[in-house]
């Protein structure tokens, strides 16, 4: 198993991944809108819709013209179509699409911020096993890299990443 602890005094060698964890059964809702990044309040409006339906988000990867919200299938159960319609009314996106069957994997390590090529190694390990990466999320702190893969590839993806860094 994987332990995630707040004790920074443990012997964590710089540049190494210290943990891999993940879960299945997520949906990613992706909104596209030209020049979305210039529209004040866009992100707040999107999150307000999720809040109004009592849905917490797991991750929120964004780009200049796209914003994705990842939530568990359990939280979205019976609400997905209503949320999609509410998003259309609230922010008038060019498109809004929900894709399910997503597993999320977190690759964690304090030293990743100074290690060149860690993300490349993650993606290479997945590519070697013919596992498509459906989503990527990495904050500027570089404490973790989040990847989304098909539910069916979850165990194989965990194994591939584990073997890359721990074998």
Label each PLM-derived region with a short phrase.
Residues 1-140, 144-167:
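C-terminal catalytic "cap/lid" subdomain
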């Amino acid at each position: 198993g994987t332990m995630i602890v707040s004790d920074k005094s443990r012997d964590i060698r710089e540049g190494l991944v210290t943990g891999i964890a993940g879960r299945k059964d997520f949906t990613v809702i992706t909104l596209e809108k030209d020049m979305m990044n210039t529209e004040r309040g866009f992100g707040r409006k999107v999150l307000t819709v999720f809040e109004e339906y009592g849905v917490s988000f797991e991750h929120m990867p964004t780009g200049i013209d796209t914003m994705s919200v990842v939530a568990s299938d359990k939280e979205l159960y019976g609400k997905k179509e209503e949320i999609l319609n509410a998003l259309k009314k609230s922010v008038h996106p060019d498109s809004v699409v929900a894709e399910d069957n997503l597993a999320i994997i977190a690759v964690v390590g304090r030293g990743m911020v100074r290690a060149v090529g860690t993300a490349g190694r993650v993606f290479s390990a997945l590519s070697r096993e013919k596992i498509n990466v459906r989503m990527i999320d990495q904050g500027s702190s570089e404490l973790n890299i989040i990847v989304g893969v098909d539910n069916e590839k979850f165990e194989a993806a965990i194994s591939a990443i584990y073997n890359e860094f721990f074998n």
